């Protein structure tokens, strides 16, 4: 009953915290500050975004094999009958309407953008899934992951902006390939699962208050780990729970490396990392938190430096940013302060939205309920070993064992509320972990 009441209390408080920022629209700085419409710049002829090859991890990913009508993977394709999209279908087989679900979702979003940008004009698809071998070897058209598009009026002066709208709609790679069309493609469904969520690999380490280090995957409620307050001062913070925990996950991580000192941090695209302002030489992180996917060489992250027995945070220049696929699991630890030192690099505990302070306030009800339960629930004794289990652990983990696998219910609640209240541009497209199909 106590846990049920706590959940109801959390839901009410979380909703109120998120609704208030969404409704506030007055002047000044704060959660309710209006976002100015983004100025859209047309793509130049032969430009592609992102600026990497199409079939790399940073774009739509590798080719996975041709899909035919007789293959087992044909069921991965779904027809698109959106009346706001014109399909050329010159083969007269309906093949151009077939595509993966991800491609369909992005195409439907783009169709709305096109009608908003040019009233009376629709999106036109000239090529979708190809079963006849008309494209180059290993083309993503053979998997239903690519489309070639124009506007219905075939006004070529619009194509640069059409490409930009495709980028904004969420296509994973957009190329102003020809003066006659724009080429767009998406990741494979299993690749999306590998890139989604906001986590660290299980092999990452944290520093414990009692000394030494511990693997992230081995953290338990009651552990106190090295973190930082909002002024950049190092301290030890209570580990509360995992916001996401997947032991068997195979994920694509961004590898952020510094040289002086030499440190390396792995985290998923949607996780937040603190970056120092250009004019800052001190240890205070301030409000600058970026998605890992936006961190670039030359920017500075915060690392632990030890000088004469004094340990403090200092900015260190990022030397390289690469991608690596690992099968070490995926873990998103939450501390009471909302920050954590992973592999000696300061990171946020949050992901999905690029506002650390928003996220930390949204978790205030969870922290409060955790503290109340820890105070109300007495530490219980583990009959097997004779030792006592901390109250915080017995309150939050029903079995007194390792934290529950999967995405934490409170994270899912906030995510769903956020999708109702926040602009889609506020949320990272790979923010919430998805299961591979």
Swiss-Prot record:
Checking Gene3D superfamilies in the record gives: 3.30.1380.10, Hedgehog/Intein (Hint) domain
So where does Ca(2+) 1 get bound? Answer: 90-91, 96, 126-127
Site (Essential for auto-cleavage) residue list: 271
The free-text tissue note of the record is:
Expressed in a number of embryonic tissues including the notochord, ventral neural tube, floor plate, lung bud, zone of polarizing activity and posterior distal mesenchyme of limbs. In the adult, expressed in lung and neural retina.
Q: Which residues form the signal peptide?
A: 1-24
Q: Which residues cross the membrane?
A: none
Name the residues annotated as site: Cleavage. 198-199
Annotated positions for site Involved in cholesterol transfer: 244
Stored PROSITE patterns: INTEIN_N_TER
Any Pfam family from its record, for instance, is HH_signal
Biological process (GO) annotations held by this record are: alpha-beta T cell differentiation; anatomical structure formation involved in morphogenesis; androgen metabolic process; angiogenesis; animal organ formation; anterior/posterior pattern specification; apoptotic signaling pathway; artery development
Uppermost EC category: hydrolase
Recorded consequence of changing residue 189 to Q: Does not affect signaling activity in any of Shh signaling assays and causes no apparent defects in cholesterol-mediated autoprocessing reactions
Tell me its family.
Answer: Belongs to the hedgehog family.
Q: What's the protein here called?
A: Sonic hedgehog protein
**Could you tell me the gene encoding this protein?**
Shh
């Amino acid at each position: 009953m106590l846990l049920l009441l706590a959940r109801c209390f959390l839901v009410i408080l979380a909703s109120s915290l998120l609704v208030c920022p969404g409704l506030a629209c007055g002047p000044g700085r704060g959660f309710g500050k209006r976002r100015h419409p983004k100025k859209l710049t047309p793509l130049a002829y032969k430009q592609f975004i992102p600026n990497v090859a199409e079939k790399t991890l940073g774009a739509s990913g590798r080719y996975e094999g041709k899909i035919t009508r007789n293959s087992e993977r044909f069921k991965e394709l779904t027809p698109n009958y959106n009346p706001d999209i014109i399909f050329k279908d010159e083969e007269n087989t309906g093949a151009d309407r077939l595509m993966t679900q991800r491609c369909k979702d992005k195409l439907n979003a783009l169709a709305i953008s096109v009608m908003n940008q040019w009233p009376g004009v629709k999106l036109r698809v000239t090529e979708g899934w190809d079963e006849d071998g008309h494209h180059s070897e290993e083309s993503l058209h053979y998997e239903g992951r690519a489309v070639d598009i124009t506007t219905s009026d075939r006004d070529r002066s619009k194509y640069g902006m059409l490409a930009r709208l495709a980028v904004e709609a969420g296509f994973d790679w957009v190329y102003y390939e020809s003066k006659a069309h724009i080429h767009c493609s998406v990741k494979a469904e299993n690749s999306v699962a590998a890139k989604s969520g906001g986590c660290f690999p299980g092999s990452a380490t944290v520093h414990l208050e009692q000394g030494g280090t511990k693997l992230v995957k081995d953290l338990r409620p009651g552990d106190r780990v090295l973190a930082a307050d909002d002024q950049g001062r190092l301290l030890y913070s209570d580990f509360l729970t995992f916001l996401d925990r997947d032991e068997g996950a195979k994920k694509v991580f961004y590898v952020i490396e510094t040289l002086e000192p030499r440190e390396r941090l792995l985290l998923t695209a949607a996780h937040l990392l603190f970056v120092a302002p250009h004019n800052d030489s001190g240890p205070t992180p301030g409000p600058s938190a970026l998605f890992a996917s936006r961190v670039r060489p030359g920017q500075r992250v915060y690392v632990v430096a030890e000088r004469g027995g004094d340990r403090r945070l200092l900015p260190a220049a990022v030397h390289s940013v690469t991608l690596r696929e690992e099968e070490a699991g995926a873990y998103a630890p939450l501390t009471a302060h909302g920050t954590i030192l992973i592999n000696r690099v300061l990171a946020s505990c949050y992901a999905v939205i690029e506002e650390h302070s928003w996220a930390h306030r949204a978790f205030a009800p969870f922290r409060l309920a955790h503290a109340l339960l820890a105070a109300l629930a007495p530490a219980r004794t583990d009959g097997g070993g004779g030792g006592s289990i901390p109250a915080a652990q017995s309150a939050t983990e029903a079995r007194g064992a390792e934290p529950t696998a999967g995405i934490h219910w409170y994270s899912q609640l906030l995510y769903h509320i956020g999708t109702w209240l926040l602009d889609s541009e506020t949320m990272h497209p790979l923010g919430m972990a998805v299961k591979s199909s």
